[in-house]
Each structure stands twice: as C-alpha cells, then as structure tokens.
Amino acid sequence: MAHSIWHEKIKSFLPEHYYGRINHFLDEAYTSGLVYPPRENVFKALQVTPLEETKVLILGQDPYHGPKQAQGLSFSVPEEISAPPSLINILKELADDIGPRDHHDLSTWASQGVLLLNACLTVPAGQANGHAGLIWEPFTDAVIKVLNEKDSPVVFILWGAYARKKKAFITNPKHHIIESPHPSPLSSYRGFFGSKPFSRTNAILEKEGMTGVDWLK
C-alpha cells in the first residue's frame, strides 16, 4: 500500500482497522465507476518519497479529474499530458523564481524528498472533490502528523485556504511553513505569484544544513 515505514507510523494515528476501511472503499469505488488515479497509483506519493527522505511537503486537495491526468502526485501530470491551469501557474511562478522548467511530470521532485500529497487520494471522473469527506482526510492528516514528529526539519508548502488549515497539525518548532493563496486561476494573482516558494524552500533547507531541491530537474 505505502512504503513500510510510512505504513507503520501512519497506523499509530488512525483508528484500528482503518486500513481495512480504506481497502473496502477502494474496492467499491473502482468497481462502481471511473476513478482517478489508476488504482495502482493511489499511494504513489508515499511509495516514491520515503519518510526518512522527506524534507518538503506540497499539499494538494484532490487528484485531477480529467482523463489520464492524475498520477498519484499532487499537481503533477504525465509528461505527454497538457499542464492543467494550476500546474501552468506553478511552473510560471517557478520560472519567475528560479528558472524555466518544461516538464509537467513532477516525479523528479518526489525523488528528491518532496512529498507531493493530496488530501484526498482519489476522485470520481469529472467530479472535483467527489470523494472529499468520505475516507481520506484522517489518513492524510495522519501523514502530516507523522511528518510533524520528524526530528529533521520539513518545509510544509501550503497553498490555499484548504491546505493552510492543516497548520494545526504542524506544532514541532523544527519545521517551517510557507503559505500563500492557491495557484489556481481564481486565486493566483492574490498572492501566489511573487511568493517565491521554491527559492524560499531552498534557502531554509540550506540554512538547516540540508541539500536544496533541484526544482528545474
């Protein structure tokens, strides 16, 4: 399901048998309709970014709900898929902050310790937030609580009001929070553009004696 160390730590913040409830939910959802991402990618964020390597969290709300977009990493799409509006704005801010990046697939960020997590890990086709409030929030809140327990610093990048509510779980003074409005077209000009989250993250990591992220890779 997820990287084994993640699995053991997350379980400690969940009611007993919660993983069984998740599996039942997934069985029902994927047999009753079209759901994104593909089932094998539901836990991809936790599979490709081990807990011990995680130094940044970028929290999204739920997967893209269009065909072939969602791949289990927040804001990322496969390389051959056109960038959705929020990702276009993320890449625009990155270009203004550090430099241009042409890739739509953010897997190389994930492989450098950037956990690309959505608060909801599944979505029905064409129905944004269609699985909100059903099963995922206790699980992904537990992920944030696990990160909060880390001894090494983590930079939490929280875009938009929904993500910023999760600050309540970040109580460890070792960690850092970068927050701004969401990169969606509705809010990007209200403070997302010009917020420089990428250079600010690297400045924090380097000050903490850690390696910065190659955001252009």
From Swiss-Prot:
Q: Which SMART domains match?
A: UDG (SM00986), UreE_C (SM00987)
User: Which sites are catalytic?
Assistant: 62 (proton acceptor)
Per its UniProt record, what InterPro entries does this chain match? UDG_fam1, Ura-DNA_Glyclase_AS, Uracil-DNA_glycosylase-like, Uracil-DNA_glycosylase-like_sf
Give the catalytic activity: Hydrolyzes single-stranded DNA or mismatched double-stranded DNA and polynucleotides, releasing free uracil
Places the protein is found = Cytoplasm
Q: Which CDD domains match?
A: UDG-F1-like
The Gene Ontology terms for molecular function here are: uracil DNA N-glycosylase activity
Q: Which Pfam families match?
A: UDG (PF03167)
Superkingdom as given in the UniProt entry? Bacteria
Tell me where it mainly resides.
Answer: cytoplasm
Q: Which GO terms describe its biological process?
A: base-excision repair, AP site formation via deaminated base removal
**Is Lipid biosynthesis included in the keywords of this UniProt record?**
no
Q: Read off the PROSITE patterns from this record.
A: U_DNA_GLYCOSYLASE
Give the record's keywords alphabetically: Cytoplasm, DNA damage, DNA repair, Hydrolase
- What do the Gene Ontology cellular component annotations say? cytoplasm
Family from the record: Belongs to the uracil-DNA glycosylase (UDG) superfamily. UNG family.
What this protein is reported to do is described as: Excises uracil residues from the DNA which can arise as a result of misincorporation of dUMP residues by DNA polymerase or due to deamination of cytosine.
Q: What is this protein called?
A: Uracil-DNA glycosylase
Origin organism is Streptococcus pyogenes serotype M5 (strain Manfredo)
